[in-house]
């Protein structure tokens, strides 16, 4: 309904739809045995609606997950036809493990950061494998505060554009910590995140990585998620057409 045609698919949703048990202790076994044909069916269903899955984010690539789950993540990404599997920045040992399976299956990995985002946060991941990329949330980068500013964000993108797989777009306030209500997530254009400047930089330099809408601000009364996603899309279009 929002006319979105390129998405990052969240694993928790698709796994539940395939019948993954709710018990965490049963999840590894399910992931080890689920047929990749199920993911090919998901790809087909989205393709029939004109939607491309450019990235898959399964919740099973952390330090406590088994090797078989990391391997599953790579296989599922390929079955979905996605360009990237995305996951959270993790420790060095786990990054090496992920890199091993990424190279084995020839899958690119986009690492996401929250408030630990900085100009050096991705250094180890990028050095560990040529298959490692940056999944940059520009709202989290600004909200982290400290040395992170609008100017450093734009420079970071310029300096690392060849290793960025995608951006998450949201408008957060500078130097605000994460909170349960997400009250510092603003309607686009009302926060401190330079969404406009980032989009224009992408346009100016013809960067080919994806910028995705991540709707996290409180939905205004009388509206809904679909309407707000459309507003965000129109915001982007207005910037790029200006």
Feature annotation, model-predicted:
Residues 1, 6, 45, 49-133, ...:
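Active-site acidic/histidine proton-transfer and metal-coordination neighborhood
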Residues 1-6, 11-13, 122, 127-242:
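Histidine-acidic metal/acid-base catalytic patches
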Residues 8-41:
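Glycine-rich, proline-tolerant flexible connector loops at the mouths of alpha/beta enzymes
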Residues 13-14, 28-30, 59-63, 89-90, ...:
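Short histidine/acidic/glycine/proline-rich micro-motifs that form metal-
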Residues 27-33, 57-62, 83, 140, ...:
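The substrate-binding groove and active-site-proximal loops of carbohydrate-active enzymes
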Residues 28-54, 129, 195-198:
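Alpha-helix-loop-beta-strand connector modules within alpha/beta enzyme cores
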Residues 36-40, 67-71, 92-95, 118-119, ...:
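Structural motif corresponding to alpha-helix initiation and N-cap regions
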Residues 42-52, 80, 101, 105, ...:
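A structural motif corresponding to the C-terminal end of an alpha-helix
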């Amino acid at each position: 309904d929002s006319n979105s045609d390129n998405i990052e698919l969240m694993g928790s949703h698709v796994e539940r739809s395939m019948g993954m048990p709710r018990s965490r202790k049963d999840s590894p076994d399910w992931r080890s045995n689920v047929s990749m044909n199920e993911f090919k069916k998901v790809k087909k269903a989205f393709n029939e609606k004109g939607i491309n899955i450019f990235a898959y984010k399964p919740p099973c690539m952390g330090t406590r997950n088994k090797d078989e789950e990391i391997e599953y993540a790579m296989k599922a990404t390929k079955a979905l036809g996605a360009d990237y599997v995305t996951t959270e920045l993790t420790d060095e040992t786990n990054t090496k493990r992920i890199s091993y399976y990424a190279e084995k299956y020839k899958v690119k990995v986009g690492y996401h950061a929250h408030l630990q985002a900085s100009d050096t946060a991705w250094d180890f991941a990028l050095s560990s494998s040529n298959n490692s990329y940056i999944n940059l949330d520009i709202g989290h980068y600004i909200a982290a505060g400290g040395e992170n500013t609008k100017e450093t964000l734009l420079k970071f993108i310029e300096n690392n554009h060849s290793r960025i797989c995608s951006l998450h777009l949201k408008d957060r306030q500078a130097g605000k910590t994460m909170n349960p209500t997400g009250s510092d997530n603003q309607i686009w254009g009302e926060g401190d995140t330079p969404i406009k400047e980032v989009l224009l930089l992408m346009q100016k330099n013809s960067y080919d990585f994806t910028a995705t809408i991540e709707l996290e601000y409180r939905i205004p009364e009388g509206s809904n998620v679909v309407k707000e996603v459309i507003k965000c899309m129109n915001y982007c279009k207005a910037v790029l057409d200006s």
